[in-house]
Every structure is written in C-alpha cells, then in structure tokens.
Swiss-Prot record:
Keywords: Lyase
EC number(s) stated in the UniProt entry for this protein: 4.2.1.104
Lineage summary: Eukaryota, Fungi, Dikarya, Ascomycota, Pezizomycotina
Single Gene Ontology MF annotation: cyanate hydratase activity
Reactions it catalyzes: cyanate + hydrogencarbonate + 3 H(+) = NH4(+) + 2 CO2
SMART domains: Cyanate_lyase
Annotated active site: 103, 106, 129
Role: Catalyzes the reaction of cyanate with bicarbonate to produce ammonia and carbon dioxide.
Protein name according to UniProt: Cyanate hydratase
Designated gene of the protein: CYN1
Amino acid sequence: MSNINLATLDISEHPNLPSSSAVLFEAKAKKKLSFEAIASAIGRNEVATAAIFYGQAKASAEDIVKLSEVLGIDRFYLESLLSGFPDRGKSVTFPPKDPLIYRLFEIVQNYGYAYKAVMNEKFGDGIMSAISFSTTVEKETDLDGNNWAVVTWRGKWLPYSRF
C-alpha cells in the first residue's frame, strides 16, 4: 500500500471558509488526488489550485469545467459555488493557530523589515505586488537526507507614484 500525503479539511475547524471548500475537499479526498495532480489536470500552479479550494482565488470558467471533470462534481453546481468573487483574507484567524501557517507569519515578522530594506535598495521606494504574483513550493533533499522546503515568491515591483 502506498503512503500518499493528502491535504484534507475539517470544515468545523474553519468556519470562515466558503461552502465550496467543503465540496471541493470532499471530492479531492474521495478521488485521493493531491493538489499537484489536480493542478496538472486543470493547467494551474498547485498553490493557485489550493487557493481556489480555500476560497482565496477566483476560478475561471475553464477552471470550473476542468475541476468538475477531475473531481466528478456537477459542472453547474460547481459553477454556482465558484462563480462569485473570493472574500480573501478571512480564512485564517490572526495570529494564526496552525503551526506551519504561524511559521510563515513568523518569517515575515522576523525578516519583514530586512526584506523591505533589501528590496528598497534593489528597486527603490515601492512594494511587491501580491496581485501580479506567483509562488511555488519545491522539495529539496540535501546530501544528509534532510528535506528542505523551498518557497519562492515572485511579485511585480510597484514603485510608489510621486504626486
């Protein structure tokens, strides 16, 4: 028997998620599909795909058709769940309680000003977009057999306007 790691969802622990999340995660678990497999089937990045499941990204009409096919969910039902605009930012309590999400928060808390200083030196006065943005997660194993998470953020640089 293979050991497959699958992200699942206990909706009772996430009352702020949209109703689509429970439907999508239930189908994902039933089909035993990883986000990587679903992303490949719909032609999206795996983090972007997971964001759709958590109601943090908008699914296109094409995404909805492909998700209905890969997950075995009626297309019209899925369309009714996913056709609105995401209500971003409500899914996580603050500060986060989940240890991994808290560590991501902690990285920004500890290194945020350092990131800001280095970016300002490289690009000038501005911000990194979280809208014109992409991210990847890779697994890297070192020579000692230790696994490392490699998280890449790629955001368009937006200089502040002078007015």
